[in-house]
A protein has these predicted regions:
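Tandem CBS (Bateman) regulatory domains
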Residues: 1-9, 50-82, 86-95, 116-155
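Glycine-/small-residue-rich active-site loops that bind phosphorylated ligands and cofactors
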Residues: 12, 42-43, 62, 79, ...
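A glycine-centered beta-loop-beta connector
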Residues: 27-29, 35-53, 94, 102-118
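The conserved cystathionine-beta-synthase
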Residues: 13-31, 38, 81-98, 104-106, ...
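Short hydrophobic/aromatic-rich motifs at helix boundaries and adjacent loops
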Residues: 6, 24-26, 41-43, 61-63
Length: 155
């Protein structure tokens, strides 16, 4: 099965010059915790921001969310996948990078969607596919492993 069959294409995004307060409002209003960051120049994905990233950046910099640009908190080490990749490849990337969501990007780096572990779980539940359920469980187990200080620094 291809990532394109499970990914969500209606994705909220932001650019790196927006303020964390604006992105926090977007997350609150749409009940999301992950936003791809898009370059205003090229339209390519240049990072991702999570609710956790924003909170920790504001806390440790001693500033309000409205004082900080997204670029001060976004992750630039982007784990992504292509729409034509097999779901197993996406699961492997999620496991390796210990993430629940992946931007789905075209060859030019532009966002075409997002695929999440929840998408895999919903698919497994709909189809009652034991092999797929096992793959999802293994991926979740890998994602949930505690990070070492070294892997946290790489993220």
């Amino acid at each position: 099965m291809k990532v394109s069959e499970l990914m969500v294409t209606d994705v909220f995004t932001c650019n790196d010059t927006e303020l964390l307060g604006d992105v926090a409002r977007l997350m609150w209003e749409h009940d999301i915790g992950f936003v791809p960051v898009i370059s205003s120049e090229s339209g390519a994905v240049v990072g991702v921001i999570t609710d956790r990233d924003g909170f920790l950046a504001a806390y440790f910099q001693g500033k309000m969310l409205w004082e900080l640009p997204v670029r001060s908190a976004m992750s630039t080490r982007i784990a992504s996948v292509s729409a034509d990749a097999e779901v197993g490849e996406a699961e492997s990337i999620m496991s390796e990078f210990q993430v629940h969501r992946l931007p789905v990007v075209a060859k030019d780096g532009k966002l075409v969607g997002v695929v999440s572990l929840n998408d895999f779980a919903r698919k497994a539940a709909r189809e009652a596919n034991e092999k797929f359920e096992e793959e999802v469980a293994v991926t979740l187990g890998a994602i949930c492993q505690p990070r070492t200080p070294e892997t946290r620094a790489e993220a």
